[in-house]
């Protein structure tokens, strides 16, 4: 837990190669009154490093799902790679995720919408800490089909038909995120606007 508070929980999901900050970003801290939590994805920050890579966005969704079970329910704020993970988790666990905010950050584009040419990449083995080079390699090329992202956006929107649970606060918009924005009911704006609106709805 990064910050105590009174009200709904908020869970921060960081970008590719990053870790949970010691304190939440100012625009988050000033816009949210409830407790704020953070999570280090596998291969990042203080989390464990598996041998030989094999990272996928779905692997990180499992990390975030475990954190969500710990806190019970939470609004998700995803940055970069964390935005994509947040969207998937919000679609899978809509009863526990009343809102999700997608923002810019490292790894937001992923590996495009279709698989590329097969290749084998061997990161430098002398690096022993985090971020795991395998995580950087695998997740930077993780495929993100537009229809896949749209499906999860629809799960979020249909689970909360009387509110606006899905906000896009990113300037960089790869194809998967453009597909999300095209869905009716998705709102665009700043992170403070999104959090203020979500917290008001949940009061």
Residue spans of the language-model regions?
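Conserved HGGG/HGGXW glycine-rich cap/lid loop of the alpha/beta-hydrolase fold
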Residues: 2-46
């Amino acid at each position: 837990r990064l910050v105590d508070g009174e009200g709904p929980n908020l869970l921060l999901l960081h970008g590719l190669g990053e870790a949970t900050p010691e304190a939440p970003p100012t625009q988050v801290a000033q816009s949210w009154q409830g407790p704020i939590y953070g999570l280090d994805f596998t291969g990042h920050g203080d989390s464990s490093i598996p041998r030989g890579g094999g990272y996928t966005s779905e692997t990180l969704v499992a990390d975030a799902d475990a954190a969500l079970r710990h806190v019970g329910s939470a609004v998700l704020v995803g940055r970069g790679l964390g935005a994509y993970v947040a969207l998937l988790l919000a679609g899978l666990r809509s009863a526990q995720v009343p809102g999700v905010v997608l923002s810019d950050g490292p790894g937001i584009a992923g590996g495009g919408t279709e698989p590329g040419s097969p290749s084998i990449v061997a990161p430098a083995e002398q690096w022993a800490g985090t971020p795991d080079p395998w995580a950087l390699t695998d997740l930077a090329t993780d495929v993100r089909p537009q229809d896949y992202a749209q499906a999860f956006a629809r799960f979020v929107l249909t689970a909360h038909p009387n509110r606006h649970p899905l906000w896009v606060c990113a300037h960089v918009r790869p194809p998967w995120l453009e597909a999300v924005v095209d869905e009716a009911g998705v709102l665009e704006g700043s992170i403070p606007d999104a959090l203020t609106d979500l917290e008001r709805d949940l009061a």
